[in-house]
Amino acid sequence: MAHNTTRRDFLKASVAGVVGAAVGTRAIRLAAQGGVADRLAVCSWSLQPTSADDLFTKLAATGLKRVQIALDPIRSNEGGGWAGFGGRASKQGLTLVSGMIGTVGEDYSTLDTIRRTGGVVPDATWPETWKNIQADAEVASALGLALVSFHAGFLPHEESDPTYAKLQGRLRQIADLFAAKKMQVAFETGQEEAPTLAGFLKKLDRPNVGVNFDPANMILYDKGDPVAALRTLGPWLRQCHLKDAVRTKKPGEWGEEVRLGTGEVNWKAFFQALDAVGFKGNLCIEREAGTQRVEDIRAAREYVQKL
């Protein structure tokens, strides 16, 4: 996810909901999926659904049947209709490729606000975030998911940083929760440079932890070249978000997210790098800006399919 709105606008915290029949399998869908077009999915939150029925309608309009599903609305039954979501999705012919969990109090207004409020970093929101994550893990398990992604927050560059050990502890706690349910977790990229994240993952030392790589986030946060970052993080790659952006001209400010294919991501080089690291996993189209989300996602799908 990126910056244009507070994540809690559509991922509200509440008591655990019920989810109904499980769908999917407990295996991250990798090499057997065929070409890129067969691995495309859409991020449910990009469609800004007001209810489960609204999500189904908008998904149909994108032309995609595979989805990374936001778990918080299911947990809280936000807008209604999420009870029994697994069974309903299956009847719609949908495949749930993974889940996404939010954290409490994230403010994407500026780079400074998200640095202070993002992920599992803030002490003030950690107890509620941890409670929600435990409930989301139950939702993900009931849906038969093999992978969930989330923003860990801004990670320290140096082990000597006083927050380094704290974040290692919290993220191991999350990793172990999902490992006990035979699931993997993936940190979303962008808030730190690739070598920093790679070093943090090595120190974390949890085999069920990897990366959800988002090339646009590397540009939005101004954290380096996406293709070079992808090569660095290849050993931890679990899933990709497909999104595009233009880098800021004012250091310390956000870049601009744009429709896929119109920004600064070199998509040909990006997919070549994916092939080079041997990644055959899910590619989830994400759009978090603009007022034409369905149209932009459909255009992104068509753009990628023509590459």
Please tell me what each predicted stretch does.
Residues Q48-L59, T129-E138, K223-A229:
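Short, acidic/polar
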Residues R66-V67, G99, Q168-E264, F271:
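Acidic/histidine-rich catalytic cores of soluble enzymes
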Residues W45-A52, L71-G81, L155-S160, G190-P195, ...:
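Acidic-and-aromatic substrate-binding clefts and catalytic sites of carbohydrate-active enzymes
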Residues T25-T50, D54-T62:
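C-terminal segment of N-terminal export signals and the immediately downstream linker at the start
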